[in-house]
Amino acid sequence: MIHLVDYALLKPYLTVDEAVAGARKAEELGVAAYCVNPIYAPVVRPLLRKVKLCVVADFPFGALPTASRIALVSRLAEVADEIDVVAPIGLVKSRRWAEVRRDLISVVGAAGGRVVKVITEEPYLRDEERYTLYDIIAEAGAHFIKSSTGFAEEAYAARQGNPVHSTPERAAAIARYIKEKGYRLGVKMAGGIRTREQAKAIVDAIGWGEDPARVRLGTSTPEALL
C-alpha cells in the first residue's frame, strides 16, 4: 500500500533540512510522490529519482486571485511532476459557479499536462456544493479529486455536518459519483490517515484496487502504513 502514498510535509515551520530528510525517506520507502510547499521544490527535486515530486499551490486556503494561481501553477509545472491545488473555496461556498469554472479551467490548463489534483476541502462542503464542484473539476481536465488539505477547521466542519478527517464513507461517495458520471478522475484521500487499518478501509471503500494512477493516500506518517 505504500506505493499509493503521497508523503506530505506541509507544516509552515518545516525546515530545509527536514524537507531534505523527507525526500530521502520518500525514496527509501518507495512512495508514489513526495509533497511539499513551493519553496522546497528546487531543493528536493534533485534528490527524487524514483518518487514523483508533488508541490501544493494556493495552499491551504485557495484564496488567491485566479491570475496569481495561474502564474504560480505555471511556474510549478517547470519543476513538479504533480501539483495539488486548492479549489477556490470561498467562491465554492458562495456558489459563484461561473467564477469557479473559469478559475479551475484556467489553473488546470496552466499546469501544461502535469498531473493536477484539485483539493475540494470536503469537511467544508454541503452535498450540493461538492457534487457541483466535482463536475467542474472533471470539466477542467484535472486528474484527481483530493479530499482535504489536512488543515481544515474542525468547528466549521462540524457546522456543515462533516467529520474533519478522511473516512471510508466519504471515499466511497466520491468514487461512486465519479463512476456514475463516467469521469476520468482518480481519488486522493488526505487528512488524518495514520494507520494501515485506516488506509486499507479507505482503499477498499473506493473499490478500484491499488493503482496509484487512480488512488492515492496523503499522509505525513507513511511508515505507519507499512
Swiss-Prot record:
Keywords: Cytoplasm, Lyase, Schiff base. The keyword Cytoplasm applies. GO terms for biological process: 2-deoxyribose 1-phosphate catabolic process; carbohydrate catabolic process; deoxyribonucleotide catabolic process. Its main location: cytoplasm. It catalyses: 2-deoxy-D-ribose 5-phosphate = D-glyceraldehyde 3-phosphate + acetaldehyde. Optimum pH is 6.0 for 2-deoxy-D-ribose 5-phosphate cleavage. The active site is at residues 84, 146, 188. The keyword Cytoplasm applies. GO terms for molecular function: deoxyribose-phosphate aldolase activity. It is found in: Cytoplasm. Its EC number is 4.1.2.4. It comes from the Archaea. One of its GO terms (cellular component) is cytoplasm. Pathway: Carbohydrate degradation; 2-deoxy-D-ribose 1-phosphate degradation; D-glyceraldehyde 3-phosphate and acetaldehyde from 2-deoxy-alpha-D-ribose 1-phosphate: step 2/2. Catalyzes a reversible aldol reaction between acetaldehyde and D-glyceraldehyde 3-phosphate to generate 2-deoxy-D-ribose 5-phosphate. Belongs to the DeoC/FbaB aldolase family. DeoC type 1 subfamily. Homodimer. This is Deoxyribose-phosphate aldolase. It comes from Pyrobaculum aerophilum (strain ATCC 51768 / DSM 7523 / JCM 9630 / CIP 104966 / NBRC 100827 / IM2). The lineage of its organism: Archaea, Thermoproteota, Thermoprotei, Thermoproteales, Thermoproteaceae.
